[in-house]
């Protein structure tokens, strides 16, 4: 059985805290935990046909999480719902959607798998795979974002990745005006 969920969080710190909460509540059944910034979702929705926002409200960060077990289909729905309710009570999440069907689950994972294409549609990116201790992911993103914005005004920073193992994709994307003009992006 597999139960994917799309979860809105306020920031990377809430995402890391949510991972700890879900592991405490669901143990080893947490099989995937992807932190995704809103900026790359916007690139996906505008640049790659066939995708739609899973939630009506816009949030700054999301988690695509999957829990799996050898049990029958649907056996994880109750425990996942309870764990998410507890996370909401603790203020860790803003909203959550548990995939209601195999089709919806596939759409959520197709979004994650299309993030590289989204960056290409925005004029390309400078991809980085960064290994960071899980507890330091929020600090890394905060410091990297600040350094990029200070050096390259208007740059779009796209962070997403496997929080559970500390592997993040941190991919700056050219400012929209430069990407649209197809001009080189050179440091000031």
Which role does the model predict for each range below?
Residues 1-188:
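Noncatalytic alpha-helical scaffold of FAD-dependent oxidoreductases
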